[in-house]
Swiss-Prot record:
GO terms for molecular function: ATP hydrolysis activity; GTP binding; ribosome binding. The keyword Protein biosynthesis does not apply. This is GTPase Der. The gene is der. GO terms for biological process: ribosome biogenesis. Gene3D superfamilies: 3.30.300.20, P-loop containing nucleotide triphosphate hydrolases. GTPase that plays an essential role in the late steps of ribosome biogenesis. It comes from Photobacterium profundum (strain SS9). Belongs to the TRAFAC class TrmE-Era-EngA-EngB-Septin-like GTPase superfamily. EngA (Der) GTPase family. SMART domains: AAA. GTP 2 binds at residues 211-218, 258-262, 323-326.
Length: 493
């Protein structure tokens, strides 16, 4: 059994810094002000050849109001999940009432707990740590997480009871929730496309839930999971990190990615907000399918369209969910649908669902569209079928003339998946106008019944081996030309 280590403490004592140090990532946001981490965030870490799971939590300071009360609940839940608790305190700030309150709670839980005095670099560590003995601990560990001082010794001691059970666990599969590997762009060859297809079949479906702040992303995530896994509060921006959560439904494995709400650039008053947006956009790149949430009670904004554009440019499959649909009268619903048709007509390949994440209305149908979009994006298509469809499209509508010559399409094959890439070979294909390229893309979409995914078509000119060589007559051709030239000359006389 892989041990679970929870990092707890009041705000801004360095929990996220230690999380990043252990997982060797920057997946937990770090900045020099309290309250930055709000959800339980899971990551995989390794000590020598042994693996363990780390949980980063929001801070508890005993003065929680509003959303911070929710954050405290997440921290307490992490304590219950953990096999080992690392209780972090700030060596520079000294002992506080909040530290004493947390220590009291931890004593009541009867969990293996290690007191970790962080930020001891540049100070007299022994003097700074002396007052923390009041917490009644058996052992104290001095670290500087930002500089990796004392971290290895701490983890060796904390994981010592699990050392025997950790041996031989290397073969166990563990999804890395903190640094999910990017799907590589497939090269334009059939062999690499096949390799990309096989790689995708071995992975769970990664579903990123994105949208502007406060449209209901975390509410939907919790509805899907059936627990208060992600902080939900009626205030924009309560999710700042991208949260990776594994789940299974009807035998299909998923990794849900709940992202920070993306807001307009002018509203990003803090560096942290900008960094969260970067994490969101990285989550889109990492996903197989993107579920974009739109607020039914607000007009479609330029930010919604900007997000759509990013998803399409990334080549990710797309499902749209119009949230907060409950409670709207019929007139408002018709107006919203009309607005969607007018402004989102360019993504007619994506399914649109009208849901209430809070009450669960319509949420179950989202899975059908997610599966449909994923299957469309990863559908294996033979070269013969792609070539046959290309020929049918060419017969129905001939390519235009380019410099007095008809463009000729020869054959097509798969070049990659997620998104599907179709490679068409022919003469002068790079000179095809954009209108004919769109025609081919739509023809393939209809013929292959692809729904929920963009299609990319790459064109490659077939090389003419004689294009750069100078034609040279054979001996017999030269004699014939000379004889014909002589005959013409004699007739003129």
């Amino acid at each position: 059994m892989i041990p679970v280590v929870a990092l707890v403490g009041r705000p801004n004592v360095g929990k996220s810094t230690l999380f990043n140090r252990l997982t060797r990532t920057r997946d937990a946001l770090v900045a020099d002000f309290p309250g930055l981490t709000r959800d339980r965030k899971y990551g995989r870490a390794e000590l020598e050849e042994h693996e363990f799971i780390v949980i980063d939590t929001g801070g508890i300071d005993g003065t929680e109001e509003g959303v911070e009360t929710k954050m405290a609940e997440q921290s307490l839940a992490a304590i219950e999940e953990a096999d080992v608790v690392l209780f972090l305190v700030d060596g520079r700030a000294g002992l506080t009432v909040s530290d004493e309150a947390i220590a009291k709670h931890l004593r009541s839980r009867d969990k293996p707990t290690f007191l970790v005095v962080n930020k001891i670099d540049g100070i007299d560590a022994d003097s700074a740590c002396a007052e923390f003995w009041k917490l009644g601990v058996d052992a104290m560990y001095q670290v500087a997480a930002a500089h990796n001082r004392g971290v290895t010794a701490l983890m060796e001691r904390a994981l010592a009871p699990f050392a025997e059970s950790l041996k031989g666990n290397d073969e166990e599969g563990l999804i890395d929730l903190s640094s999910v590997e990017d799907i590589e762009k497939a090269d334009l060859t059939e062999e690499d496309a096949e390799a990309a297809y096989k790689r995708l079949q071995e992975q769970p479906i990664k579903l990123a839930i994105i949208g502007r702040p406060n449209v209901g992303k975390s509410t939907l995530t919790n509805r899907i999971l059936g627990e208060e896994r992600v902080v939900v509060y009626d205030m924009p921006g309560t999710t700042r990190d991208s949260i990776y959560i594994p789940m299974e439904r009807d035998g299909q494995e998923y990794v849900l990615i709940d992202t920070a709400g993306v807001r307009r650039r002018k509203n990003m008053n803090q560096v942290v907000e900008k960094f969260s947006v970067i994490q969101t956009l990285k989550a889109v790149e990492d996903a197989n399918v993107v579920l974009l949430i739109i607020d039914a009670r607000e007009n479609i904004s330029d930010q919604d369209l900007s997000l759509l554009g990013f998803v399409l440019n990334s080549g990710r499959s797309l499902v749209l969910a119009v949230n907060k649909w409950d409670g709207l009268d019929n007139e408002v619903k018709e107006r919203v649908k009309s607005e969607l048709d007018r402004r989102l007509g360019f993504i007619d390949f994506a399914r649109i669902h009208f849901i209430s994440a809070l009450h669960g209305t319509g949420v179950g149908h989202l899975y059908d569209s997610v599966i449909e979009a994923y299957k469309s994006a990863t559908k294996r298509i033979s070269t013969s079928l792609l070539t046959r469809i290309m020929q049918m499209a060419q017969d129905d509508h001939q390519p235009p003339m380019v410099r007095g010559r008809r463009v000729k399409l020869k054959y097509a094959h798969a070049g990659g998946y997620n998104p599907p890439i179709i490679v068409i070979h022919g003469n002068q294909v790079n000179d095809l106008p954009a209108s004919y390229k769109r025609y081919l893309m739509n023809y393939y979409r209809r013929s292959l019944e692809m729904m929920g995914t963009p299609i990319r078509i790459q064109f490659q000119n077939s090389e003419n081996p004689f294009e750069t060589t100078k034609q040279k007559l054979t001996v017999s051709q030269a004699r014939k030309r000379k004889r014909l030239t002589g005959m013409i000359h004699n007739r003129r006389k």
